[in-house]
Amino acid sequence: MNRQGKSVEISELSKIFSSSGSIVVAHYKGISVAQIKDLRKKMREAGGGVKVAKNRLVKIAIRDTSIRGISDLFVGQSLIVYSDSPVIAPKISVSFSNDNNEFRVLGGVVEKGVLNQDSIKQIASLPDLEGIRAGIISAIQSNATRLVRLLGTPQTQVVRAISAFVDKNQQG
């Protein structure tokens, strides 16, 4: 790759690092091209991407940024999995790692915070934004249903009491 090509690659990498909500760094030694294509497809469908780049160029791209702490992860055959969502890249990377033993998640960045492998795995276990929204809506709906039942119960009891009183007076 010539100097101009390297410059273009560095600017592409800088754009990925500055605009992504989450970035996962992984080793892919021993992974087939078909498996990498599968990972790329999953990330593309989720709105993210996978980038294989020379470690030296990645280190130059992050040298003067707040995420330069991940530069130590770029040794050997490394790739970057990224997405705008803080959960998507970790979730898909960890899932892919569980299915492919040769693919090893090393660490990454979420919302400009440098994280180790364990933290990335913890984030991967979190529900995505849609799951959180569904949980909140479910909680609100169940509480609203309980409230309606609670408000309806005294009225029902009053009606039953009046009905019993009327029945008693009609009999007696």
From Swiss-Prot:
UniProt KW keywords: Ribonucleoprotein, Ribosomal protein, RNA-binding, rRNA-binding
Keyword Ribosomal protein: yes
One Gene Ontology CC term in the entry: large ribosomal subunit
CDD domains: Ribosomal_L10
UniProt record, GO biological process: translation
GO molecular function list: large ribosomal subunit rRNA binding; structural constituent of ribosome
SUPFAM superfamilies: Ribosomal protein L10-like
Gene3D superfamilies documented for this protein: 3.30.70.1730
Superkingdom of the organism of origin: Bacteria
Subunit structure: Part of the ribosomal stalk of the 50S ribosomal subunit. The N-terminus interacts with L11 and the large rRNA to form the base of the stalk. The C-terminus forms an elongated spine to which L12 dimers bind in a sequential fashion forming a multimeric L10(L12)X complex.
Main function: Forms part of the ribosomal stalk, playing a central role in the interaction of the ribosome with GTP-bound translation factors.
Family affiliation: Belongs to the universal ribosomal protein uL10 family.
Name of protein: Large ribosomal subunit protein uL10
Organism: Liberibacter asiaticus (Citrus greening disease)
Recorded name of the encoding gene: rplJ
